[in-house]
């Protein structure tokens, strides 16, 4: 397969994401317009995880790996009504936490990490969530993506947490192509202009979750379809015509 066809192979019949040479990347003006349109539709994008403070956000994001935000929110609703600080989580204990989050995948490991990171926050950070990447990544169960989410959402940092949705959007649209999650993150950091840098993570993840879907992107209602490199665009679903039933004609008496 030629280099050109390989980069254009992400079609409705072939959903594997391929990675771009420089010609696939959107131009600077198109990137600005891409974000401008997303911002116009959603001026104040927010995470869909429910939380009340930076600590609860950290717990929610830690619990969200391989789980949906909806599932995490259901599990943490009662938990966050009871637990608002690391000290309260430590007091709740491992088994108490497990009882709250047992509906979430991998809840045993997640519970262990949450208790462990809570103990460290109490011991080393006066019960506060640090706004520093290195300090966050030193916590059990906290990787680069989780640290980026917390820094961006809780502290307004210009960080770009790349999950499966943003990885797909970055490569499919050409806004930030890259072969790895880190490559996409670096491309976003390099190419995302002001005033969109703080909101970029939320705009892109919501775009990937609800419009630029993995199996069938909804190009027919996409606000940036004309800027996107994805070809051919998916057509709107066909509307089945309703069958009108009539009463059978009765024979004349």
Stretches with model-predicted labels:
Residues 24-242, 248:
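Catalytic cores of DNA base-excision repair glycosylases
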Residues 1-23, 233-253:
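Polybasic, lysine-enriched low-complexity intrinsically disordered terminal tails
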């Amino acid at each position: 397969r030629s280099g050109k066809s390989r980069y254009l192979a992400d079609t409705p019949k072939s959903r594997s994401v391929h990675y771009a040479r420089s010609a696939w990347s959107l131009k600077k003006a198109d990137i600005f317009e891409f974000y401008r349109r997303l911002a116009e539709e959603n001026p104040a994008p927010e995470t869909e995880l429910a939380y009340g403070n930076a600590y609860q956000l950290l717990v929610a994001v830690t619990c969200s790996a391989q789980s949906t935000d909806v599932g995490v929110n259901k599990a943490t609703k009662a938990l966050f009504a009871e637990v608002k600080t690391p000290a309260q989580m430590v007091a709740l204990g491992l088994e108490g936490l497990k009882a709250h989050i047992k509906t979430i995948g991998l809840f045993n490991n997640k519970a262990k990490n949450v208790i462990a990171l809570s103990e460290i926050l109490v011991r080393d950070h006066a019960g506060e969530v640090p706004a520093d990447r290195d300090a966050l990544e030193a916590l059990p169960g906290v990787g680069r993506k989780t640290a980026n989410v917390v820094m961006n959402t809780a502290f307004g940092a210009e960080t770009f947490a790349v999950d499966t949705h943003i990885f797909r959007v970055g490569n499919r649209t050409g806004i930030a192509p890259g072969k790895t999650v880190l490559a996409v993150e670096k491309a976003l950091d390099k190419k995302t202009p002001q005033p969109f840098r703080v909101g970029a993570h939320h705009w892109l993840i919501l775009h990937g979750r609800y419009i630029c879907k993995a199996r069938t992107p909804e190009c027919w209602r996409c606000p940036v379809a004309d800027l996107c490199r994805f070809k051919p665009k998916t057509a709107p679903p066909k509307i089945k015509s309703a069958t009108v039933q009539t009463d059978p004609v009765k024979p004349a008496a």
